[in-house]
């Protein structure tokens, strides 16, 4: 089981679990309120997070969702506190509240193209035989941007969208220079080909770079990224996006010039990013 990590008196996070697609969960501890980031992918995930927080005498008061995907909202009922979502996330939650998560219905949605095998398999693994999922309505609904004063520390929540999920939010903690990006920099998985689009990526990176952060959280990355490491990832995305436009999505040409620009052979991760941009080029 994952152990809660303390980065400061204000900032704690629980690392992700790849096998069952558990994302990072986090707590921002203010003098008056404690904000939790995402609810987890099951009641068990949420319970584990709450127990880990309790070992530091921390209890959440309010929770913010990064987006609507199952692994971020299935723990919402167990969290049992007011929650914050943008209106797009709210609408998607209302939609999936009606779903059954039993094998038969999951498999039917995969067959219909509503669900994807990756998520269906992870849901079956995480939930086991406990398939009754209750997702309560989010409490506070916003559009655009919202600022929270937790007492001695603040949080800015901004709806930024992106390829992965149009409802994606980022959360910025100015006093900690910490930026939680949820899944917004990941590819669109609900498509025939997992992909990035050049235009959406450019707009998203512009918004992200407007925040003065020194520590960055991607929900399924093992731990936070420092400024240099995150900057390298952003540079890769920018170069790949530019070359995708320049070469009209020609994989071979993009790989050739990218390798030349970087002065090295591309890694598997590099090639995955190239593949996503090529997959999204129209």
Regions picked out by a protein language model, each given a short descriptive name:
Residues 79-84, 199-255:
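Divalent-metal (often Zn2+) His-rich catalytic cores of metallo-beta-lactamase-fold enzymes
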Residues 154-209:
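Active-site-proximal loop/helix segments of hydrolase catalytic cores
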Residues 6, 95-158:
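Metallo-beta-lactamase
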Residues 2-51, 169-183:
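Conserved beta-strand hairpin/beta-sheet module of binuclear metal-dependent hydrolase folds
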Residues 22, 43-44, 68-74, 90-93, ...:
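Active-site environment of divalent metal-dependent phosphoester hydrolases
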Residues 245-282:
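C-terminal regulatory/interaction regions
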Residues 36-40, 61-69, 84-87, 159-161, ...:
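Active-site neighborhood of phospho(di)ester-bond hydrolases with catalytic His/Asp-centered motifs
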Residues 44-89, 212:
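Active-site metal-binding motif and surrounding structural segment of the metallo-beta-lactamase
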């Amino acid at each position: 089981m994952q152990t809660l990590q303390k980065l400061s008196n204000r900032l704690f996070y629980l690392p992700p679990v790849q096998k069952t697609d558990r994302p990072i969960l986090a707590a921002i501890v203010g003098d008056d309120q404690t904000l939790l980031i995402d609810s987890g992918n099951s009641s068990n995930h949420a319970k584990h997070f709450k127990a880990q927080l309790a070992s530091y005498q921390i209890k959440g008061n309010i929770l913010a969702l990064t987006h609507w995907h199952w692994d971020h909202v299935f723990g919402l009922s167990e969290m049992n506190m007011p929650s914050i979502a943008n209106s797009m996330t709210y609408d998607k939650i209302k939609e999936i509240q009606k779903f059954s998560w039993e094998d038969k219905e999951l498999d039917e949605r995969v067959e219909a193209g509503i669900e994807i095998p990756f998520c269906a398999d992870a849901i079956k693994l995480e939930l086991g035989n406990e398939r009754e999922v209750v997702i309560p309505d989010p409490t506070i609904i916003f559009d655009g941007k919202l600022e929270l004063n937790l007492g001695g520390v603040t949080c800015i929540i901004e709806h930024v969208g992106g390829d992965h999920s149009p409802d994606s939010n980022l959360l910025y903690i100015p006093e900690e220079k910490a930026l939680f990006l949820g899944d917004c920099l990941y590819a669109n998985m609900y498509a025939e080909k997992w992909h990035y689009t050049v235009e959406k990526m450019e707009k998203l990176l512009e918004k992200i770079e407007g925040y003065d952060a020194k520590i960055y959280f991607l929900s399924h990355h093992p731990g936070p990224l420092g400024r240099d490491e995150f900057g390298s990832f952003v540079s890769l995305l920018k170069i790949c996006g530019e070359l995708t436009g320049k070469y009209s999505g020609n994989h071979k040409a993009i790989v050739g010039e990218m390798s030349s620009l970087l002065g090295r052979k591309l890694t598997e991760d590099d090639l995955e990013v190239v593949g996503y941009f090529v997959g999204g080029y129209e």
